[in-house]
Amino acid sequence: MATTLNVVAPKGGSKGSVELPAAIFDQQTNVPLIHQVVTAQLAAARQGTHKTKGRGEVSGSGRKPFKQKGTGRSRQGSVRAPEHRGGGMVHSLEPRDYSQRTPKKMIAAALLGVLSDRARGERLHVVESFGLDDAPSTKTAIELLDAVATSKNVLVVLERNDEVSFKSVRNLKHVHVLFADQLNAYDAVVSDDIVFTKAAFDAFVAAKSGAVSTGSTTEKEAGE
């Protein structure tokens, strides 16, 4: 895998390069781990407010609708039974919390695994900027993205203070935009290409490099 990545200038061409740290962009892509983390993330997004009434909760009389024998019909004990129209639901749904506990190291490993896969597949890109002045321009953003990534689903990663670029790409149908500190395994894995601005890339690498070095130091101290 290449250890550097060309930085694309707003007007096209190369504007230098950036290093791809092996600790971030050359990690094992553990598919079962990524699946587990993505499933947990989607489960946590569920509201879990579903509720249906059981036979003990629906309105209706508790008396026997007709006598036990002599009518020719099947015996019934209540109009609130599930087989009746307006009766309660069998195994009624109750509000519940779908969130799963996922260790932080697993979440981090899943994200690095996806980013490493995109880097190995040459689907990770860095642009110097979107070449915008003080005013947003979706047209300019589209031209740059079309030159960098031609896939149907593109993830754009920006810095939080880059409001002009954010406003320029947020309404594009095939583009999903995140800030560097929001990057996660799900949004990365459902995107065909990932496009960083150089400022966002530097911020992301700096944050992850600090986390990786801290984790390595902790494990070394634990071993001693």
PLM region spans:
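Extended polybasic, low-complexity segments that bind anionic RNA or targeting/receptor surfaces
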Residues: 1-47, 92-224
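A short, aromatic/hydrophobic, helix- or strand-capping loop or linear motif
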Residues: 48-52
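Glycine/serine-rich anion-binding loops at beta->alpha junctions
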Residues: 53-91
